[in-house]
């Protein structure tokens, strides 16, 4: 994982530390208050945890751009997804067998992140026709649907990667897909937690004021 210090704001490692800290707090609260607890302390911690996903999306895009070996990078992400599956499911009492306990949140977000990288590679392929790329995108959406953040994480990575070089457009796509996930939560799972998901947009504020300039990342 390679990073250079930036002229202003946070460097890559500092942003990653924020993401890891927020994720740890979020997951710890899920274990202390299982289910969709409306305890104010739990809600506050879950709001803090919303910082994690968009930072992950951003660094998947940056990692893809700067990696020296995209095949090894892809392999590392899928290994992470495999390890995270057992850790995530053990922590939350979910069956290790996919889809046995339902279709929502059946594995960690790492599964969707890894497939998001695959979509970036597919999108940049010069050999694949557009219709086949579209078919693959829909197939990846189906494959990643049961994971934490569902297929939204993979598709958000694709759109943010397509807008690389235009930070404002990247943040717009981030907010659009975050709002989509929030709407699903609001309609099908829990209204309060649907609103909580909207706090993902806090990451936009963080990036606007603290984002790293001229930072290289090889995740």
Question: What name fits each language-model region?
Answer:
Residues 1-150, 154-158, 169-175, 186, ...:
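Membrane-cytosol interface segments of multi-pass membrane proteins
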Residues 11, 216-219:
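Short intrinsically disordered, low-complexity segments
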Residues 180-184:
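Active-site rim beta-loop-alpha module in soluble metabolic enzymes
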Residues 208-217:
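Conserved small/polar residues in nucleotide/adenosyl-binding loops
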């Amino acid at each position: 994982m390679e990073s250079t210090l930036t002229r202003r704001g946070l460097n890559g490692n500092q942003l990653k530390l924020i993401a890891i800290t927020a994720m740890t707090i979020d997951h710890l609260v899920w274990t202390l208050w299982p289910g969709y607890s409306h305890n104010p302390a739990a809600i506050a911690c879950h709001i803090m945890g919303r910082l994690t996903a968009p930072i992950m999306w951003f660094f998947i895009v940056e990692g893809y751009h700067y990696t020296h070996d995209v095949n090894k990078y892809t392999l590392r992400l899928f290994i992470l997804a495999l390890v995270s599956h057992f850790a995530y499911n053990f922590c939350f009492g979910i069956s290790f067998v996919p889809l046995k306990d339902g279709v929502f949140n059946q594995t960690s977000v790492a599964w969707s992140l890894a497939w998001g990288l695959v979509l970036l590679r597919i999108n940049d392929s010069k050999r694949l026709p557009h219709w086949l790329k579209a078919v693959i995108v829909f197939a990846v959406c189906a494959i990643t649907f049961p994971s934490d953040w569902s297929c939204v994480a993979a598709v958000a990575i694709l759109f943010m990667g397509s807008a690389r070089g235009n930070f404002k457009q990247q943040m717009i796509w981030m907010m659009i897909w975050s709002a989509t996930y929030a709407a699903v939560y609001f309609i099908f799972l829990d209204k309060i937690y649907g609103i909580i998901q909207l706090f993902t947009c806090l990451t936009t504020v963080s990036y606007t004021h603290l984002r790293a300039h001229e930072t290289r990342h090889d995740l």
